[in-house]
Amino acid sequence: FDPVARVGGMNHFLLAEPPRHVRNQAFDSDYGLFLMELLVNEMLSLGAHKSRMRARLYGGANLNPDLKPIGTANAVFARQFLEREGIPKVFEDLEGVQARRIQFRPAGGQVRARLVPADSAPTQKPLGRPQSALGTVELF
């Protein structure tokens, strides 16, 4: 969020980086680094200045104890990204075992975050991966 330009954005990524065995075939658009760069660049194009940007981090929960700690890896990635880019982190609510519901008003930088009760979080796996819309054109 840039409070002077009143420009903000929010990202949600499921994996910080592709697993090693598929790195050469993975779409960059599915992973944290690409998505974070895209967000920062879009904010800059809307008048934000990197020197004024401030970040809040939410998420990184490890929802399934049977899987690798993906949420922890995402939290580590997000912290490192901000540090590398010189964007100060003003708040974080990361990790744990509960999902979060985030509401963000980008023009004013207001955030409301709530933990989602474990019994209301989705437990079923999605049926399939949607096709990436990157590089497609919709005519209307």
Which ranges hold each PLM region?
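Short acidic-hydrophobic catalytic motif
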Residues: 2-54, 63-140
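Local cysteine-cluster metal-coordination motifs and their immediate loop/turn environment
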Residues: 60
